Regions:
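C-terminal segment of classical bacterial N-terminal signal peptides
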Residues: 1-4
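Extracellular glycan-recognition surfaces and repeat-rich motifs
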Residues: 6-66, 73, 138
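Terminal, low-complexity interaction segments
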Residues: 11-13, 134-178
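Extracellular beta-strand-rich recognition modules
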Residues: 14, 88-101, 115, 162, ...
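Short coil-to-beta strand junction motifs in C2/discoidin
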Residues: 104-116
Length: 178
């Protein structure tokens, strides 16, 4: 993921382990090595078959309330203190994908599952930036939630990572993402 004005000035690609140095996972992180994870992972098992991966590693989440993963739901990843002093027209850009379908052939996003990125400038309170939700009900795919109403109504996530770019309103000295 990156924050940028005209050119990228901050990038976190997860290629090296930055847990507790470049980013934190306050509720915890971990993996059972296969299907339950909230961690920096790669396509190292038959369960993860993503394409268009930007490098080798990425931050992934699957069945995060399992004890082998974060053990709680929701779980968060924080990147704080990004220096934005003197920058304007900020943008957030990141690649997102969904691991699907599961072995049964069904999608595995259930009612209440979501992924959301929020930002705050100078500790001014978090604002929604981009969200993904199920399409309603259980065993649905993830869709972008374009109006933040809790229902996916936009672009459907696929197993191929796709880039999403959003504008960040405001200016200041320090940007936090979660």
């Amino acid at each position: 993921l990156s924050a940028q004005a005209q050119t990228a000035f901050f990038t976190e690609d997860f290629e090296t382990d930055g847990l507790n140095t470049r980013y934190t996972a306050p509720e915890g992180s971990g993996s059972d090595g296969d299907q339950d994870y909230f961690d920096r992972i790669s396509n190292d098992t038959s369960d993860r078959t993503h394409t268009n991966v930007q490098g080798t590693f990425y931050w992934g989440a699957q069945d995060i309330d399992d004890g082998a993963a974060a053990g709680v739901k929701p779980a968060s990843l924080l990147i704080t203190g990004i220096d934005i002093t003197g920058r304007s027209s900020l943008q957030f850009s990141a690649y997102f994908a969904e691991q699907r379908p599961e072995a049964s052939g069904e999608d595995d996003i259930d009612s209440g599952d979501f992924a959301i990125v929020e930002y705050q400038i100078d500790n001014g309170g978090y604002q929604s930036l981009i969200a993904f939700e199920g399409g309603g009900g259980n065993n649905t795919p993830f869709f972008e939630d374009t109006d933040f109403d809790g229902t996916g109504d936009g672009t459907q996530l696929e197993t191929a990572f796709a880039q999403f770019t959003k504008s960040i309103a405001g200016t200041g000295d320090s940007l936090d993402l979660r």
